[in-house]
Structure formats: C-alpha cells, structure tokens
Regions:
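Extracellular/periplasmic bilobal clamshell ligand-binding domains
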Residues: 179-213
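A ligand-binding cleft/hinge motif common to bilobed small-molecule-binding domains
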Residues: 99, 104-122
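Extracytoplasmic ligand-binding site segments that recognize negatively charged/polar headgroups
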Residues: 1-95, 99
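A bilobed periplasmic-binding-protein/Venus flytrap-type ligand-binding module shared by bacterial periplasmic
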Residues: 16-21, 136-148, 167-170
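Short amphipathic alpha-helical coupling segments at ligand-binding clamshell hinges
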Residues: 71, 75, 137, 147-159, ...
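Short secondary-structure boundary segments
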Residues: 19, 49, 110-111, 171
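Periplasmic-binding protein-like
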Residues: 40-51, 75-80, 87-88, 119-143, 158-180
C-alpha cells in the first residue's frame, strides 16, 4: 500500500445463493462467474453496476483476469441479460434480493453471505473458479496547507490503532501482522488483480461494462 494511506477494511466477492430458490427452480449450482451467463439463470440473478458500486469491480476483476477483456464482454453481456431489471446500484442489493427470494443467485461480499448462513438463513455461497478478488478501504489525511485540521492526523491514528478490533466484526479479513481471519471467512480461492487498481483502470472497466448493457 502507498505510504500515505492505511487500509482499514477489506472485502472479497463471491457468488451468493438462496438454497430454497435453487431447489424450487431446479437450478444447477454455478461454480464460476462465467456460469452466470448460462440461459438457465435468466431472471434468476442479481448483480451490481460498476458505475455506482465498487462491489461490481470484484466481478469484473475476476472475469477479466480469467478471460481477457474481449471474452469478458461476451460473458458480461449475457450476465446482464440474465439479470435484467436486477442490475443494482447498491453493493448490498443483490444479497438483499437473494435473501428475500426475489432471485436465486447474486454476486456480493463474501463476509455478508458467511454471516447470513451462520444466522440460519437459506443462504449459501460459492467461491468462483476465477477467484475471490478483494478491495480495501483506506484512510489518509489530506494536506490542505493552512486549512489542514490539526486534529485530523490524531483522529486517523486513533482509528488505525484502536478501531480494527471492532471493524473486524463486520469486515473480518486480516490486514495487519498479528491479526487472524477465522476459518469461516477464509475464502477458497483468493486472487489479486495483476494491475494496480487505479482510477484510470476503474474508468476503463466502467466503460467496458457500459458496452455490455
């Protein structure tokens, strides 16, 4: 990570399932992100829009890493066709629709699916063959010269040094030496995108996504 920022949370993406909906509709269990393009899932899946949610970037990273940009366009076009009106602006919306039984399959944050399953909801998840890609949220202090709040660095230091224990209750992935991720939240196929996740790369992937709608 750059020296000017400190990560405070990390999230991974995965395929989320409503087990009751899967059984009722006699749907095949997907094993990959590419599977979500199959015609049998038309009207049965929900994903997020990368123009409004970084959760969708986890899906794009997986597809592009495995298949390259051109094949990803073909796959994503079919995924969006299957999702129809269930392409969501919020990263948590697909999980909410899976919970409610509006769709059988969604793409979302892994730790949320793990928590729902542990709570006894009819929720399961599949770590896709393409990998569980991750994003971090980081904290930094902006130097605004004379307008810099002198307490800003103290607040940032307090969050980094004292907030991680509580943050890990919702974002359980370990980030720092000495932290541990419990076994339920250890993903089956962690991957890292080969390029730095810059604003320019995000805009490039947003453009690719728009071409698939």
């Amino acid at each position: 990570f750059p020296e000017y920022c400190a990560p405070i949370t990390a999230q991974e993406g995965t395929i989320i399932l409503n087990t009751e909906m899967m059984e009722e509709n006699n749907l095949t269990m997907p094993s990959s992100l590419k599977d979500l393009a199959k015609p049998e899932y038309e009207g049965m899946i929900s994903v997020t829009d990368i123009s409004s949610s970084s959760t969708a970037w986890l899906l794009l990273q997986g597809l592009i890493s495995a298949y390259g940009e051109e094949e990803t366009k073909e796959i994503l076009t079919e995924i969006y066709k299957n999702a129809g009106d269930h392409i969501e602006e919020s990263g948590s919306a697909p999980l909410k629709k899976v919970r409610a039984g509006e769709v059988a399959i969604g793409f979302g944050l892994r730790q949320q699916a793990v928590a729902d399953k542990a709570d006894g909801l009819p929720i399961d998840f599949v770590d896709p063959e393409e990998g569980n890609f991750s994003l971090t949220e980081s904290l930094c202090v902006v130097d605004k010269g004379d307008r810099t709040n002198e307490k800003a660095m103290e607040m940032a230091k307090c969050i980094v040094e004292h907030a991680r224990e509580e943050l890990q209750q919702s974002y359980p992935l370990a980030l720092y030496r000495g932290e541990e991720t419990d076994s339920e939240n250890l993903s089956g196929n962690p991957k890292v995108f080969e390029e730095p996740l810059t604003i320019e790369l995000l805009e490039k992937h947003q453009k690719l996504s728009e071409e698939c709608k």
